[in-house]
Regions:
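Short glycine- and Lys/Arg-enriched binding-loop motifs that mark or flank ligand-binding interfaces
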Residues: 35, 202, 210
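Radical SAM enzyme core and accessory elements
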Residues: 194, 206-225
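Amphipathic, soluble alpha/beta structural segments
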Residues: 1-2, 29, 155-156, 215, ...
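Short, flexible micro-motifs
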Residues: 8, 40-42, 77, 209, ...
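Short beta->alpha linker loops
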Residues: 74, 204-205
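Conserved AdoMet/S-adenosylmethionine-binding subsite of the radical SAM
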Residues: 14-195, 199
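Canonical Radical SAM [4Fe-4S] cluster-binding loop centered on the CxxxCxxC motif
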Residues: 1-13
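Short secondary-structure capping/turn micro-motifs that flank functional sites
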Residues: 6, 142, 172-173, 207-209
């Protein structure tokens, strides 16, 4: 989805309207929220903070901060700014690689905020807020799914009490990347757990009809749906 480039940031009211629309469509109260793409939530800091204030208010949807996760690709100054708010939400860091060589190839933001700088910011965030952090790790065949990568990842976050979500990537036309197969994802998870890191394999939903994360919006913009 991000291959189309940035258009604009959403305003707080627009983000709130997504919650109200979803509640109306399903006929149930929304109890948990994940702020995760398209785009970088911390790049829209003021509007996201306004949204969080509104959505957690008893006069709004009254969703507790502990039921809200906020994702970031690793904007270090914004992580520090968020820490100052001392919100009780869960920070979810899109790490995807345990070292700079691999991460810079996958995520250009790593050139500005390399792994060691990012991890320092995450530890500061934990110290300031007292909240556990989770790490998102997209599994890419032959890129970041080796035993060596598992060991490096464990060394990077061991002792933080953090949780790792392992996510087999969804196929996208024109991408050189493919997902790690299920057996090797499981092997990677077991390796992390043997090294003292709590890890979960994220379920893949919708990829068989190109409606999974990163797929549907791109296909719609390209006139395929």
């Amino acid at each position: 989805s991000t291959q189309a480039g940035r258009v604009r940031n959403l305003e707080a009211g627009e983000i709130c309207s997504e919650i109200y629309t979803a509640q109306k469509d399903i006929g149930e109260r929304i109890s948990h929220i994940v702020l995760m793409g398209i785009g970088e939530p911390l790049d829209n800091f003021d509007e996201v903070m306004r949204f969080l204030e509104n959505i957690s208010s008893p006069e709004g949807v009254n969703i507790g901060m502990r039921n809200i996760s906020l994702s970031t690709c690793g904007l270090v100054p914004k992580i520090d700014q968020l820490a100052e708010k001392k919100l009780q939400l869960t920070l979810s860091v899109s790490l995807h690689a345990p070292n700079n060589d691999i991460r810079s190839g996958m995520m250009p933001v790593n050139d500005a905020y390399p792994v060691e700088v990012l991890m320092q910011a995450v530890r500061r965030y934990q110290e300031t807020t007292g909240r556990r952090v989770s790490f998102e790790y997209s599994m890419v065949r032959g890129v970041n799914d080796s035993d060596a990568c598992a060991r490096q990842l464990a060394d990077l976050i061991r002792g933080m009490g953090a949780h790792v979500n392992l996510i087999p990537i969804n196929p996208v036309d024109g991408s050189p990347y493919s997902a790690t197969d299920a057996a090797n994802v499981r092997r990677f998870q077991q390796k992390l757990e043997s090294l003292g890191v709590n890890a979960t394999v994220r379920r893949r939903l919708g990829s068989e009809i190109s409606a999974a994360c990163g797929q549907l919006r791109r296909d719609e913009m390209n006139g395929k749906v």
